[in-house]
């Protein structure tokens, strides 16, 4: 990946700026932030913040909703801080591919992706607990996967590098059968679009929306209609 951009946090020039909190236990997202030079703490969202796929949702809608829920979950448990949450899925021929449940599920995903172009979507939510403002955005990266041989598929499954990764692959693993199309964000495939994150931070005060209920309770009713 190219050099990762970094932006100053909102209010960084004030005497008491908010600190950045990563609402994710993903080591890959933490590594991206560290590589870009951000200082942050980690407070993962609870499992209940992820309710899965709603039948009427598109992939972009899903990752936006889950990023919001994850941020809201952490915001409800802190007194101060700028919360960063994200959710990533792959999408291929109308199928939304999250993290595989097991080896068989990973193989099913990889056979679907093999020889096809597909998309990776990451929803990003920044939420200021102090100001009760948030912004949500979604970034898409187009990928091309070569036709996987049985040997390549078996080697990848045996390596366990599919575990915990949307679409059962990790771009950062350097597989020569997986390429980003054009100039789309590589870090987005890893789990956090660093270029867009820098833009969101730079423009947070201008673009963030005010919210009056900093908990996930306000969106539970809409989630209950998922089926």
From Swiss-Prot:
Residues 1-21 are annotated as: Disordered. GO terms for molecular function: dTTP diphosphatase activity; nucleoside triphosphate diphosphatase activity; UTP diphosphatase activity. The active site is at 87 (proton acceptor). CDD domains: Maf. It catalyses: dTTP + H2O = dTMP + diphosphate + H(+); UTP + H2O = UMP + diphosphate + H(+). The keyword Hydrolase applies. NCBIfam families: maf. This is dTTP/UTP pyrophosphatase.
């Amino acid at each position: 990946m190219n050099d990762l951009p970094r932006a100053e946090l909102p209010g960084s020039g004030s005497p008491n700026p908010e600190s950045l909190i990563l609402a994710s236990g993903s080591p890959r997202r933490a590594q991206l932030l560290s590589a870009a030079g951000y200082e942050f703490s980690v407070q993962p969202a609870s499992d209940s913040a992820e309710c899965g796929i709603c039948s009427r949702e598109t992939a972009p809608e899903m990752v936006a909703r889950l990023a919001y829920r994850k941020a809201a979950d952490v915001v409800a448990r802190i007194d101060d801080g700028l919360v960063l949450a994200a959710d990533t899925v792959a999408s291929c021929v109308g199928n939304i591919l999250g993290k595989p449940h097991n080896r068989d599920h990973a193989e099913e995903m990889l056979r679907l992706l093999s020889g096809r172009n597909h998309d990776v979507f990451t929803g990003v939510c920044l939420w200021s607990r102090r100001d009760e403002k948030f912004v949500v955005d979604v970034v898409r990266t187009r990928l091309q996967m070569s036709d996987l041989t049985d040997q390549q598929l078996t080697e990848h499954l045996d390596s366990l590098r599919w575990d915990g990764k949307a679409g059962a692959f990790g771009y950062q693993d350097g597989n020569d059968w997986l390429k980003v199309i054009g100039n789309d964000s590589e870090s987005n495939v890893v789990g956090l679009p660093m270029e867009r994150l820098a833009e969101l931070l730079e423009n947070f005060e201008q673009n963030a929306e005010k919210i009056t209920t900093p908990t996930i309770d306000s969106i539970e009713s809409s989630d209950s209609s998922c089926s």
